[in-house]
From Swiss-Prot:
It comes from Marinobacter nauticus (strain ATCC 700491 / DSM 11845 / VT8) (Marinobacter aquaeolei). Gene3D superfamilies: Nucleoid-associated protein YbaB-like domain. Homodimer. Residues 11-21, 91-107 have a biased composition (Low complexity). This is Nucleoid-associated protein Maqu_1612. One of its GO terms (molecular function) is DNA binding.
Amino acid sequence: MMNNMGDLMKKAQQMQEQMQKAQEEIAKAEVTGESGAGLVKVTMNGRHDVRKVDIDPSLLSEDKEILEDLLAAAVNDAVRRVEANQKDKMSGMMSGMGMPPGFKMPF
């Protein structure tokens, strides 16, 4: 019984270390959201910090409202990509630990 408890504690510690490593990788990962067929691009890291905004020069002569809409759409696209990347990383890690798909960790 004591040996099983020791194994369980060791496994829990390994899971926590793997989770921390995955969270660090997710935070560093960068994705680029786009709108207007790539005329506006927003690069964001896994913590949702916007790292770069790229606006095609042809849009600078357009109506301000159009540019604002395209920028908002690009940011929203980047947020969705960050969330998809997080989900992929975590589900890959969970399946590697033998956890069922969709299992939510308590931390």
